[in-house]
Each structure stands twice: as structure tokens, then as C-alpha cells.
Design a protein with these regions (language model features):
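Class I SAM-dependent methyltransferase Rossmann-like catalytic core
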Residues: 1-29, 34-47
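A structural signal for well-ordered alpha-helical segments within the folded catalytic domains
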Residues: 5, 9-12, 77-80, 139, ...
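Conserved SAM-binding loop
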Residues: 27, 74-161
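Residue-level detector of flexible, active-site-proximal loop/helix-junction positions
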Residues: 34, 97-99, 109, 188-193
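Short, glycine/serine-rich, charged loops/turns that create anion-binding
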Residues: 34-35, 97, 158, 224
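Aromatic- and Gly/Pro-rich amphipathic surface segment
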Residues: 35-91
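A short acidic (Asp/Glu
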Residues: 39-42, 102-103, 163-165
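S-adenosyl-L-methionine-dependent methyltransferase catalytic module, highlighting the catalytic core
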Residues: 67-73, 84-86, 132-241
């Protein structure tokens, strides 16, 4: 799983919106997210934080190759040290011990109660599409978000056989809009690994010619804590609220 530069920039903007105070922010990531950026880009992306606290990955060359980044990208930042430097404690879960994982969980099933409303930011770096019980997996992400916290998804929209599913904008728009969240971003992300960019797509209206190999990126904020239910598609009368 990986987070491209536009998503990392979005995370920086989210962290700036969350109350800093004296409390460190709590982040949950559904699988370990490789960060597809150079350590040299850190001061521009996180100008209010000390880049000296962020360690480069010893396996940067292998990660660059795996994700199609050019060698000129240089060293990539270590995920934990970056989140630590920006004032966040990150918890990483996965179904297997793949890389740096804190806890083994099966996201096809409901998470344990200690996850409920426990995190300021929940990250899905491209995981829910690999879970067959995808509705429950997205519900797990939503229920883990604390009041006024955020959830970010980055999943395939037109990446065939990447996972079990390609996802449409209306999925996240309807699910979060109907469950006490406020939508902050709905976009496609496309382009080569070193130059990905957001592209506008309609949230609920039918459209054609989706960008090839595109990801669906959504950000929502939990403005009202309630039981998470199953949405009705806007096309068939689903209402916000």
C-alpha cells in the first residue's frame, strides 16, 4: 500500500485542521503505507514541522522499484518517523505481518470495541478493495473516527484486477454523507508514480471515460457521531444527513 504526494499533502492539510493543543493526534492506517515522496520534499509539504526528525528508509531503493518511482527520487521517508514528527501516533493494522504492523486484524469482520471513535484520522491507503466484505471494512474505518476526526480513502477506480473491486465516487459520497460525515474531497488521482495529480470527477452523476489506472480519493470529517448504517444511493433517493 502506498500514498502518493497529493495524498500526503492532503494529510498535511488535515493535520493542520485538527486541534493540536498538548495532545498528540491518533492515526489508524489500514495496512502499512509507503510514502511516495522524497525526503527533500518534506520541508515544502510540512513547513511547520522539523524535517530533521524524519528518518530516510534504508530500503528506499526497493520501495522505489516496487512502486515505479525513478531512482532520481532519492531516499523516501520512514512512515512512522514522519507521522511522529508531525505530532501523530500511528497504529498500523493488517491481516498479515506485512512490514511494520502493530496489530493483526481481519477487516472483513467488525473491529474490537477499543477502536470505536478512537482516532483523529483513519487512513485507507488502498486496502478496502482487497477485503471481500467491503461494506464492513468501510464501516470499520468510519466507526474508528472520533468526533471531528477525518477519514481518507485512496482506492482503485479504474485498475482492473488490482483488487476485488473498483470503486465509484458515489460510494464514498453516499456512505459518509448519510452517516454524519461532511465530505471534504472527492477526486480521481492519475498519472505516473512520480507525478500523480488530482482530477475532478462528479460525486454522484454518471460520467464516462474515467482516467486509466486512476484511484478514487475521498476525505470526510465526522461532524456527528451516530450508528453507522448502510446508505441508499443518491440516484435512488438517498438523502444526506
Amino acid at each position: 500500500m502506498a500514498l502518493a504526494l497529493p495524498i500526503i499533502q492532503t494529510i498535511g492539510a488535515i493535520v493542520d485542521k485538527l486541534p493540536a493543543g498538548t495532545r498528540r493526534l491518533k492515526v489508524l492506517s489500514l495496512a502499512h503505507p509507503d510514502l511516495l515522496m522524497s525526503v527533500d520534499q518534506i520541508p515544502r509539504v510540512f513547513p511547520h514541522h522539523d524535517p530533521e526528525k524524519i528518518q530516510p528508509r534504508a530500503d528506499s531503493a526497493d520501495v522505489r522499484k516496487r512502486h515505479g518511482l525513478p531512482e532520481s527520487t532519492g531516499d523516501l521517508p520512514d512512515t512512522r518517523s514522519l507521522f511522529d514528527a508531525i505530532g501523530c501516533d500511528i497504529t498500523i493494522v493488517d491481516v498479515v505481518e506485512a512490514g511494520d504492523v502493530d496489530r493483526i486484524v481481519d477487516l472483513n469482520e467488525p473491529l474490537d470495541p477499543d477502536y470505536r471513535e478512537a482516532f483523529d484520522l483513519v487512513l485507507d491507503p488502498g486496502t478496502v478493495e482487497h477485503c471481500f466484505n467491503i461494506g464492513q471494512t468501510i464501516r470499520n474505518a468510519a466507526t474508528s473516527v472520533a468526533a471531528d476526526g477525518f477519514v481518507l480513502h485512496a482506492n482503485p477506480m479504474s485498475m482492473f484486477n488490482h483488487g476485488f473491486y473498483n470503486l465509484n465516487p458515489t460510494l464514498f459520497y453516499d456512505f459518509y454523507n448519510q452517516n454524519g460525515f461532511e465530505i471534504h474531497l472527492i477526486a480521481a488521482m492519475t498519472g505516473p508514480a512520480a507525478a500523480r495529480k488530482f482530477v475532478d470527477v462528479p460525486a454522484v452523476k454518471r460520467f464516462r471515460n474515467a482516467p486509466p489506472e486512476a484511484r478514487m480519493v475521498s476525505v470526510a470529517r465526522r461532524v456527528e457521531v451516530r450508528e453507522i448504517g448502510w446508505p441508499t444511493q443518491t440516484k435512488y433517493g438517498g438523502k444526506s444527513g
